Amino acid sequence: MSVSTLVFSVSIMFNWWRRATRKLMVFDYDETFSPVAMLKSIRILIAIATFHDYEIWQMDVKTTFLNGKLSEDVYMRQPEGFVQSEHPNRVCKLQKSIYGLKQASRRWNICFDEKIKEFGFLRSEDEPCVYVRTNGSIVVFLVLYVDDILLMGNDIPTLQSVKTWLGKCFSMKDMGDATYILGIKIYRYRSRRLIGLSQSTYIDKVLKKFNMQDSKKGFIPMQHGLALTKAQYPSSSSELEKMSGFLIPRL
């Protein structure tokens, strides 16, 4: 694909997305909720895979939300630069989901659920983004977090077949062995069946966001008699809430 073709394609996608975010005067989306895998579920499955010395592979879905099929009629104005001169007042009827739709995430989740079940996976009743497939002694776990996929199993040919199936259904990127997921760095020592999870990169990102990257590490509980200045305190309640919000979901 040439650079000019790529720029043209990106321009089309941007215009459609911008139109979609302003698509309706009357909002009627039906259900828009879409589940994602819980972080504790990911940690538990990684621990199980490490204990049994399973493979832990990672894949990424490209243009995720463009895969969903719409169950309702959605219309939008023609995007700027691509208006039909003979019918400038006509609107477009979407055939599939696009970025910007309220229901895009849910439609993608439903689409993925249907496709992966066709390949013999069963969905967990308690964790809707965790799937399992078994065949005798062969077991494969699949974890979905929006567009991130973790594959864990004890049979490489079976795992390869899952990759092939996903590649037929969606545009995929093979990430190989899982080393980084949801801001968590994975350190694996297979010979000892040990694994380490580190969020140092995420911590550095949060510190940089609040201009604290040069801060020195401290210890809790704080030293007796430590005096704090107002300059060290969040400048507003809003900033305090933001700082807390980055920490609480990760505990």
Describe every region a protein language model picked out.
Residues 1-251:
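Long, low-complexity, charge-biased intrinsically disordered regions
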